[in-house]
Amino acid sequence: MWKIHNKLLIYILWIMEIRLVSSFTSVMLCGRIPGLTPGQRNMCREMPDALIALGEGHQLGAQECQHQFRGHRWNCSEVWQRNVFAHVIPTASREAAYTYAIASAGAAYAVTAACARGNISTCGCDVRHKATPTGGGTPDEPWKWGGCSADVDFGMRYARRFMDARELERDSRTLMNLHNNRAGRTLVKKMLRTDCKCHGVSGSCVMKTCWKSLPPFRLVGDRLMLKYQKAKTVQAVKGKRGLRLVLSRKKHAGTARAQKPVLDWPKRMELIYLEASPNYCERSLQTGSQGTSGRTCQRTGHGPQSCDLLCCGRGHNTQHIRRTTQCRCQFRWCCEVKCDECDESYEEFTCK
Amino acid sequence: MDYQYFEEESDYIDLDEEEEDDDVVTAGSLDHRFGQPNGEEDYYFGGDDVEEELVVDGHGVLELAGRLLESLQSCVQPSVLQVMQYVAPMLLLCLLCRLLCLLYSQRRRLTSLAPLHLFHFACGLIILQITVGYRLLLLLLLAAVGYLLLQLLRLGRRGAQVLAVLTVGSQFLYELLIWRRRSDWPQLRGIQMVVNMKLISLGFDLTASGQLQARIPGPFAYLGYIYSPATCALGPWVSFGCYMDCLVPRNSWLVSLRRLLPNVVICVLAVTVSNCVAPALSDFFGDSSHFLVMYWDALSVRSSHYFVGMMAQALLVASDQRLDGATKESDMLGPLISQPWRIEWPRSISSLVRSWNIPMHEWLKRYIYAPCKPTASTSRGRILVVVLSTYLVSSLLHGMDLRIYLVLISLAFLAEGESLLRRQLASLLNACITANLCPGKERCRYSHCPSKRRLNSLSYWLARLTNLAFTALAIFHLAYLGVVLLGDDLEVGEDGDSFLWHWQQAGYLSHYIGLGTFVLYLFIS
């Protein structure tokens, strides 16, 4: 029932044209989309056509997360399907860090791409790259820029306002989410490419044309996956202006002297998490773990998708599947298609 | 209801702030627990992550095509807009200069040519101001130095030769002087190269009979010639006599506007291919064929040259400036600077070299090749030395760019070897397979000419196939030599061997083919 309701809303959202969305969404649809906080609903009413881009970004993040974690025990399912514009992970784990970062990166990526396509009415070309009438300029900026480059700053600002508006508390989990959100969208900005081309007499550089372009989102996911593997454990300490997160330190049991602890801050582009991950073997609502029972695994092979690792030592079931498919189809004049029937059988392994 | 979230400064740690509290209170009252990752997690995440991605071929190709279209879309629009911002002021200033010269020439009876020169100089200055900005002062300083060097012509022919040597040498001096700001030089190099060619041609023209046969042009005429709006930013070289002949425009406006449109359209197409299409295709074929990567990267270099040439042709048409050697004027495009159709489908390397930059070819032929070539009983070795000298001077005009030297000297060897071999083969086989195009049916001195024989003749198809093989070889040489010129020349100092990477990947095949051509020629003759 709840899922049907969500799919109906998604269907209504995607099938409308921008004009209808501009008039209808601001009144009706912004109030009905589940998972939005009041601040996000206000932003939805202010700029309804950006909501479509955010929906695309949401799907970008969801698909990329499920692609990167395919074959892992925690495969990024169930997290994105609960709400339309929300992703909730109860445990402040390493996987939660990746999830928030990829969601923020997807939102920033999609809004920036929508600006470049002209799908959002209030953002246009990056005005800093507009050509001035006089070509003199300052010596620090010798080249004249023109045309539409990807307005990445608008995407950054809008994604930040929208994704950070979900954090209503003022606890350590919120600090962690805000940090990982920023790491995700800043990565998109850093991965922008600037291509330039010189034109002039005999290969000189009398004229120069430059443009910026977004990389494929798969590269963003791959880069975040590297950061996920190097994520840092943090803990909350009380500072002058409230809570702050510092890197956790390994305690040396052999040290007799109690030295003054030196606090380390996490770097801006690092992913951080507060809690150790559960083993994700058993289903647990408290930790958001779906368990690996029923998952397809590989009997021959290594890595996280192998049956020994994926099934947590519980063993696997072997199912012999035999099916008949149509093959070697040929068109006969006139007018029928005839196919042969081929039998194929294989084994499928699932975790107990 | 406004949402609440943390302020900017409290989101992240301020690095300047130092924590003075000695008692770090671990927030035990928080609802989140923290600790070290357990051993099982380390084993799980530290495992072997090598996974085989089963990429479906159809999906992969579709994804690549989508990525191709996306990169094209984000590249074409900025490129065309930026190019139009360059082209439009230049064209308007050329048309303005032409209008002013026309009004002045119709109003009075040409009592003095100084206002015409001033119109050219002023419009050229505005174009250079728009293009290079504050570096215009450096260009004017170099022009003053050039005018002082021009006084050497009082010494006669020897003075012209000294002027040529000093002009080419000063190109290196300029680069060394502004080495600290050498990022400025790639923008000025092309402009100064055309100025140097104009100076040298002016020197040799004025001392053609051995002595200074005419007065040295005055400052206004000199500045109008050097910085004429049609030729100051993008070339090409025109001689001083040709500039004087075209001070008063003669063609009608309708002819010029009719010729402007195809030039501008080809400009836009060429810059689109150079910026967007060729790099995208190079990325597309990046894993399959190294030759295709070389070809598309070299096409990016060539289409950049076509873009500059077509834009310069548009400026010539707008100013009604003709080129030297008026036989190569097209009715649709006006004066031709390059002929892309003969470069993309060359008959031989020497024919594509002549079609690359026709005014520069005219300049080299008139002032370097013809004086060095003796008229009586020219030997093969002497011609080879003269050709190499011509290519060397062409390299020196480009200044301090090692890639230009490598490409042009290699081009000299390849072109001359091919020309010698084909001439020898044509004599042996009595067929029209020389490097130059054979004349028509009556004047062809070989018996196996495509124009003499009929289509069903065997020698016709053999001659055609041989020429086709040489065309394919020239296309390969074009891709091989052109790919080195891709990218900024300032990268030479940083990565010493980076621009030779493509040649190493190809195994220096073009150079070996050139060497084999010479060996085969010596073996036959």
Curated annotation (Swiss-Prot), chain A:
GO terms for molecular function: cytokine activity; frizzled binding; signaling receptor binding. SMART domains: WNT1. Pfam families: wnt. CDD domains: Wnt_Wnt7 (cd19339). Residues 1-23 form the signal peptide. It comes from the Eukaryota. GO terms for cellular component: extracellular region; extracellular space. InterPro entries: Wnt, Wnt_C, Wnt_CS. Binds as a ligand to a family of frizzled seven-transmembrane receptors and acts through a cascade of genes on the nucleus. Segment polarity protein. May function in gonadogenesis and limb development. Wg and Wnt2 have a role in the developing trachea and together are responsible for all dorsal trunk formation. This is Protein Wnt-2. It comes from Drosophila melanogaster.
Curated annotation (Swiss-Prot), chain B:
It is an enzyme of class 2 (transferase). One of its GO terms (biological process) is protein maturation. The chain crosses the membrane at residues 83-103, 125-145, 159-179, 220-240, 260-280, 301-318, 395-415, 467-487, 505-525. It holds the Pfam family MBOAT. Its main location: endoplasmic reticulum. One of its GO terms (molecular function) is acyltransferase activity, transferring groups other than amino-acyl groups. One of its GO terms (cellular component) is endoplasmic reticulum membrane. Its EC number is 2.3.1.250. It is a multi-pass membrane protein. It catalyses: [Wnt protein]-L-serine + (9Z)-hexadecenoyl-CoA = [Wnt protein]-O-(9Z)-hexadecenoyl-L-serine + CoA. Keywords: Acyltransferase, Endoplasmic reticulum, Membrane, Transferase, Transmembrane, Transmembrane helix, Wnt signaling pathway. It is found in: Endoplasmic reticulum membrane. The active site is at H398. InterPro entries: LPLAT_7/PORCN-like (IPR049941), MBOAT_fam (IPR004299). Belongs to the membrane-bound acyltransferase family. Porcupine subfamily. Protein-serine O-palmitoleoyltransferase that acts as a key regulator of the Wnt signaling pathway by mediating the attachment of palmitoleate, a 16-carbon monounsaturated fatty acid (C16:1(9Z)), to Wnt proteins. Serine palmitoleoylation of Wnt proteins is required for efficient binding to frizzled receptors. Also facilitates the glycosylation of Wnt family members, including wg and Wnt5. The cotranslational disulfide bond formation of wg competes with the N-glycosylation. Porc stimulates the post-translational N-glycosylation by anchoring wg at the ER membrane, probably through acylation. Interacts with wg and Wnt5. This is Protein-serine O-palmitoleoyltransferase porcupine.
